[in-house]
Amino acid sequence: SSSSAASDVYKRQTTIGPVAIAYNLGDTEINLSTETLGKIFKGEIKKWNDEAIAADNEGTDLPDKDITVIFRSDESGTSANFQKFLKAATGDWDSEGKQFPDTVGEGANGSSGVADQVANIDGAITYVESGFADQKEGDGVKKAKIDFGHGPVELSTESVNKALENLEFKETDSEHNMVVDSEALFSSDNEGAYPLILTTYNIVCSKGYDEETSKLVKSFFTTVLDHQDDQLAEQGFIPVEGAHLDKLKAAVDALQ
């Protein structure tokens, strides 16, 4: 837009995509602490009945079965965010970027690829956008409950929005330029919150529109926020609600 040359550019979230820890272990329901999760993906925990997993799942009969880690073989924003999460949440993860290290487990291409692999391999585990895990539920794929510090949390609309309640943003020139502080998000441990999420952004000029264009831009973003429908949910995205939705609407109102 020509107006952006004379105005600040705002980033704001439109959809929130939670990342599931998806696994294939028959009917066994699994809880994993962030520390245990990091050790699994580093290859330090190799069996499902490892004492660390047993400590996270008291009273559960865990199988003496090999863990097969499945990772994204292609470059991916999900891999970049998951590695940021492991570093922030555990303090013990050295790799970063869109390429996941290929030192442990097996690679698969794309979100559907890793979900397929987990469905096909008994004992497999991966990180994947929630919707792809849901699509494989009928093939034995389950989502682990993650203990971020206050007990195991199930991935749900409620737990993701709980994480969004205390979302921190990076220091910018405007409160309406909403760039998420992912390090603060991933290391947060609010009770009942699921902070392992991907945020996607729209980029928009903050001002400089003529009256008609301003109305169109505001109308577009208002419609996006007001119609977070079942179709989004089917693709694994979570509708934004509550206080965070109010902040996003205020940012739309501030456009000039």
PLM region descriptions:
Residues R12, A20-Y23, T68-F71, N81, ...:
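Structural recognition of the beta-strand scaffold that forms the well-ordered cores
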Residues I16-I21, D27, D66-I67, G151-P152, ...:
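Small-molecule pocket liners
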Residues E58-K65, H176-V179, E183-Q256:
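Extracellular/periplasmic juxtamembrane helices and adjacent flexible linkers that interface
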Residues D8, T15-I70, D74:
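A conserved helix-loop-strand patch within extracytoplasmic ligand-binding domains
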Residues D8, Y23-T28, D66-R72, P101-G105, ...:
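Second-shell loop/turn segments in exported
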Residues E75-K170:
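Ligand-binding pocket segment of bilobal, Venus flytrap-like solute-binding proteins
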Residues Y23-G26, K39-D50, D74-E75, Q83-G91, ...:
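Sec-exported extracytoplasmic/periplasmic mature domains
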Residues S1-A6, Y10:
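Single conserved hydrophobic/aromatic residue that forms the stacking wall/gate
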